[in-house]
Amino acid sequence: MCCKRDAMLQLVQEEALVLRSPRDFRVPVLSVARYLEIRALRLELEGLGAFEAAQRIDDATLADLERLLQANEDAIARHDLAAALQCNQAFHLGLAQAAGMPTLKRFVDHLWMQTAPLIAAGYASFSPDMRVGHHHAIIDALRQRDGPAARHAIEQDILDGGTQMLAYVMRQERMHAGATQKEMDEEEHEAQD
């Protein structure tokens, strides 16, 4: 039990969980402002990581990223979203690792820890192309050792997914502020008209 509690406390320290009482650990609800801050940091850090990775990547690491992309596509095809999510996260973190910048990798890990539950909640609603479409462009840029193209592709990946994530976070924030499901559905319907 001690090891589990230590692991849970580490997740609290990483801001992936919130400790409400000694026995009550919860996934934090991100505010819109907090989500936008994390997304802005991911854009900068993962963009820099992709740029640097394109300059430094070796054939073995590139092959690993290609395998992760294929595994992600396979998981999506068999509707295994848990596996697809793991592959998606591993791809992003592997790209950060390929940059050869350990501090950057730690920051990216920390940001992913904070947003993993949110990404999991929204991933099911993404189209297959949205889930991995930009990953193909990243691989192409890495093969060509094209740092600016790699940066652009990872930024587009984060932004495209971020649109749906932002809508989800806004909805969650309104729910916690007391809006009813019916009110939110009506607002969403009016916005679509």
Predicted regions mapped to residue ranges:
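Conserved amphipathic alpha-helical segments that form helical-bundle/coiled-coil interaction surfaces
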Residues: 33-34, 38, 59-120, 133-140, ...
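Alpha-helix N-cap/N′ positions at the starts of helices
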Residues: 22, 45, 67, 130-133
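Intrinsically disordered, low-complexity segments enriched in polar/charged residues with Gly/Pro
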Residues: 3-4, 14, 60-62, 126
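C-terminal regulatory/effector modules of DNA-binding transcriptional regulators
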Residues: 124-193
